[in-house]
């Protein structure tokens, strides 16, 4: 609640200041005919929308409890808010870029630069205040690596296993380690796991009530109040970074307004109503009447210098480049999280190799690693083992492998080799039905016969034991026999002869 309260207060304060200043810029831009300030007011409007999105995302992200329709809660609301903010800012950059190109084609002269300067300084002060409020979110990325960035507590942590509500075993992290080592995550639901095994009672000091405990329900991590603030802060970094980038863009816009107003005020010599001059920076002179051009009462002069008029669009293009450079990482990161790609710090090939090197593991398939939000990385895998007796020890080793890669929420689906089966022949013991085989699971494709083969192939139901025996015999055949023929099961229909009856 502390982190949410601070973020909410900062967002509300910045929202009020931004909205008030946006109204002020719209009024001043109309009075001074300053298109630069009008574009900056539109930037402020986008910031108002961004702050509203951030507030809504922060509000929804507090609802971490699982529901029947949303088993992970609303933990990804802030990631979605970060993506929306990045898209708003990117669209704004292209709008400013188009306006800057138009300014190069048709330069505009600023009216009342002192008023524009005053409003620009006030806007800069407002944005400096916003940068002070959100500067902690300026450079903190998500999932930057493993180590002390998991949001889990130090000290003694209780062992336990999550109560399985579906097929598979939810593996937690290893027991608590020393403070100088990696932090751990425990998945505690009750005192027994899905196999009815009691929790370790040998070290009762690990179950102290003052120790930080993490509880995972339906894949949603729920922490005690000691660690909730730190984890929520990390989970909302993308959203708050989006707000920071908007405030930074406003600050750059205010700097551009101030610099442009100062340069224009001290360097531009424009034409006034009582002055006789021409403006070579425009296609037509600013005083185009014949009386002024033919007048000999005062010498003619030129307005300028013209480079002052091109300073504003040049600075706008520089601002667009800076904003795009700072927004692209946020846009890319939030989009990749929502696309459930493998986090960049996870080497999936090395992870698969380590899992296959574990003693007792025959095959690893259907491995999926993705990032929920912040530092919460989730993995699921099908692990084929030799026998059920050694599975628990294998699961603990697999859990340690995942933990070493920074993955603390893992779901393992165990598979045990059938009698006489080989891993190379049957890579998946729990293959899907033919309806879903092409979509997910082990990707097994049913054999499809075409042409005359389809007519000759009879539909026969055989047991799994018979199928394994046939496959074993098939694998033992030598290469001298040529191509391996398909297993043909012939069914001969012997007609039942009726016994002849004699009278």
Swiss-Prot record:
6 X 2 AA approximate repeats of H-G: region residues: 145-156
Transmembrane annotation, as ranges: 11-31, 36-56, 79-99, 114-134, 244-264, 304-324
Biased composition (Basic and acidic residues): 200-211
GO biological process, one term: intracellular zinc ion homeostasis
Biased composition (Polar residues): 184-196
Alphabetical list of InterPro entries matching this protein: Cation_efflux, Cation_efflux_CTD_sf, Cation_efflux_TMD_sf
Cytoplasmic topology ranges: 1-10, 57-78, 135-243, 325-503
Catalysed reaction, written as an equation: Zn(2+)(in) + 2 H(+)(out) = Zn(2+)(out) + 2 H(+)(in)
A GO term for molecular function: zinc ion transmembrane transporter activity
Reported tissue expression: Widely expressed.
Superkingdom field: Eukaryota
Main subcellular localisation: membrane
Segments for region (Disordered): 140-213
Function: Zinc ion:proton antiporter that could function at the plasma membrane mediating zinc efflux from cells against its electrochemical gradient protecting them from intracellular zinc accumulation and toxicity. Alternatively, could prevent the transport to the plasma membrane of CACNB2, the L-type calcium channels regulatory subunit, through a yet to be defined mechanism. By modulating the expression of these channels at the plasma membrane, could prevent calcium and zinc influx into cells. By the same mechanism, could also prevent L-type calcium channels-mediated heavy metal influx into cells.
Protein name: Proton-coupled zinc antiporter SLC30A1
Lineage start: Eukaryota, Metazoa, Chordata, Craniata, Vertebrata
The gene coding this protein: Slc30a1
